[in-house]
Amino acid sequence: MSSSKINPAIQFYEGVDETAIPEIRLTRSKDGKTGQAIFVFQKPDALSEATTGDITGMTLIDDEGALKTREVKARFLNGEPSAIEATYTWKTESDFERFMRFAERYAKKNGLGYSSK
């Protein structure tokens, strides 16, 4: 990788950063090895009339590289797309740690905090 800093970003289309900030919920198995991060984007740019093409996945990008998932669904309200729900799944502790490093960078860039419910 180059020495330049890559701003942490989420993309539904390659090269186009999503500006809507998602709500993110984490779940983990009892042994802590597997789990999911569920992202919900209300009124994301990716669903605007200006965007064209199909959403085939979500990419989380930062200095370490990219994390990808194809598990992406649209939510509809009155027949119109209103939100995107995407699920990133990890299967090992190291995958979880990598995801958390991305999440911390993304949160810091966007002034977000963490709350336990």
From Swiss-Prot:
The biological process GO terms on file are: photosynthesis
| InterPro entries on file | Psb28_c1_sf (IPR038676), PSII_Psb28_class-1 (IPR005610)
Q: What is this protein called?
A: Photosystem II reaction center Psb28 protein
Q: According to the lineage, what is the superkingdom? A: Bacteria
Describe, as the record does, how this protein assembles with itself and its partners: Part of the photosystem II complex.
User: Any idea where this protein resides?
Assistant: Cellular thylakoid membrane
Lineage of the species this protein comes from:
Bacteria, Bacillati, Cyanobacteriota, Cyanophyceae, Synechococcales
Q: Which Pfam families match?
A: Psb28 (PF03912)
Keywords of the record, alphabetical order, are: Membrane, Photosynthesis, Photosystem II, Thylakoid
Family per similarity comment? Belongs to the Psb28 family.
Report if keyword Membrane is assigned: yes
Q: What is its main location?
A: membrane
Q: Name one GO cellular component term.
A: plasma membrane-derived thylakoid membrane
Q: How is this protein positioned relative to the membrane?
A: Peripheral membrane protein
Which gene specifies this protein's sequence? psb28
